[in-house]
Structure formats: structure tokens, C-alpha cells
């Protein structure tokens, strides 16, 4: 399909679905890069289709495929059930401690916040799992998103499960199994 170079990959897919193939299946929700629903592999790199412009992919045709390491449901739609289960397996929800404040009161200027800041940008899109070679080698490896979430919660002073989270994070079958044997295939940015 011919499209302007500043067209987002997602917009091109919507147009293809509208004009050429109404059965084409893909996910999207927010269309502004916040939710990660439209994550897919574009010209061999994990991308959010709503934030990826056709022009940024260079001249010529653009190839799209579903994320790697996920069961395929149809066309560009993958099953995220195992991804969500891996987050649950590592305890990816805050468990308030006995003296935890009822509302998050972590100052944006505090050292704790600066330590956590980089890790809280994860939107749970699955691109890191797709880009990981370790996921393909060890089915017990929870993936970068789950490890990132565990780390973030392990650094939060309000969490009553901090010690347990660190044990999970450092468990031989989780993190140690991945170190030194595999790396991300490429950046998922």
C-alpha cells in the first residue's frame, strides 16, 4: 500500500484493514504510545506501531510480524497470558507492609525515587520478552518486564514483601540462569 512517509505503521495497518483486508488482526488502544498494545516487530525490530513512522524504517517496503516468544492468536495478535502469569509468578504487585502509608508519598526528589525512576517506565508491552534470546532458551526465565517489576517493588520502602522479592529476583532459576549466557537480541526501544 502506498502511504505518506510520516504515516504511523499503526495507521497504515488500520487503512489496510479498512480498504483491503477486513480480517487483518492486530491490537491497539491508546494510539499515543502509552499502553503498548500495538507492540510488534517492524522491519526486524520490536516497536510500538503507533509511534513508528514509515519514514523511520527507511526506503522500500515495511515488514511487520507478531512479537517473538509469544503464542500466535492470529495475524499480528499474540497471547499475552503467559506474560501476565510471569508477572504474577514473581509477585508483581505491591503488598503494603504493616506501617505502610495508605497513599504513595515518595517524593519525586528523593533518592529512593531517583533509584526507582528508570524502572517505572515499563508499560508491560512485551517487547523486551520478544527481543530476549534468553526467553527462547529457558522457559522458566520470567523475562525482563517481570524482573524489572520485581526490582522496582524491591526498592519500594512501603512493600511488605521486599525480602521475598529479593529472594525471587536472585533465585538461581530466575536471574542467575540468564546471566552470561544470553543477551537481548537488540534494543526494544
What are these regions (language model features)?
Residues 6-22, 64-189:
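Ferredoxin-type iron-sulfur electron-transfer modules in oxidoreductases and energy-metabolism complexes
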Residues 39-40, 132:
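Short beta-strand scaffold segments in enzyme catalytic cores
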Residues 45-64:
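Glycine-rich phosphate/adenylate-binding loop and adjacent beta-alpha elements
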Residues 38, 58-59, 186-188:
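Extracellular/mature segments of secreted proteins
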Amino acid at each position: 500500500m502506498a502511504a505518506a512517509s510520516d504515516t504511523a505503521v499503526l495507521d497504515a495497518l488500520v487503512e489496510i484493514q479498512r480498504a483491503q483486508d477486513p480480517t487483518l488482526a492486530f491490537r491497539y488502544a491508546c494510539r499515543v504510545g502509552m499502553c503498548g498494545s500495538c507492540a510488534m516487530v517492524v522491519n526486524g525490530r520490536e516497536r510500538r506501531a503507533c509511534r513508528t513512522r514509515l519514514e523511520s524504517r527507511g526506503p522500500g517496503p515495511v515488514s511487520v510480524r507478531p512479537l517473538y516468544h509469544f503464542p500466535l492468536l492470529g495475524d499480528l495478535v499474540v497471547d499475552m497470558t503467559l506474560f501476565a502469569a510471569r508477572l504474577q509468578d514473581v509477585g508483581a504487585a505491591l503488598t503494603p507492609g504493616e506501617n505502610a502509608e495508605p497513599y504513595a508519598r515518595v517524593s519525586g526528589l528523593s533518592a529512593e525515587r531517583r533509584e526507582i525512576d528508570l524502572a517505572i517506565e515499563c508499560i508491560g508491552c512485551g517487547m523486551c520478552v520478544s527481543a530476549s534470546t534468553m526467553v527462547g532458551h529457558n522457559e522458566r526465565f520470567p523475562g525482563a518486564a517481570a524482573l524489572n517489576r520485581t526490582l522496582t517493588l524491591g526498592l519500594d520502602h512501603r512493600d511488605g514483601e521486599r525480602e521475598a522479592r529479593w529472594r525471587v529476583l536472585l533465585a538461581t532459576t530466575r536471574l542467575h540462569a540468564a546471566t552470561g549466557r544470553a543477551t537481548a537480541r537488540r534494543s526494544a526501544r
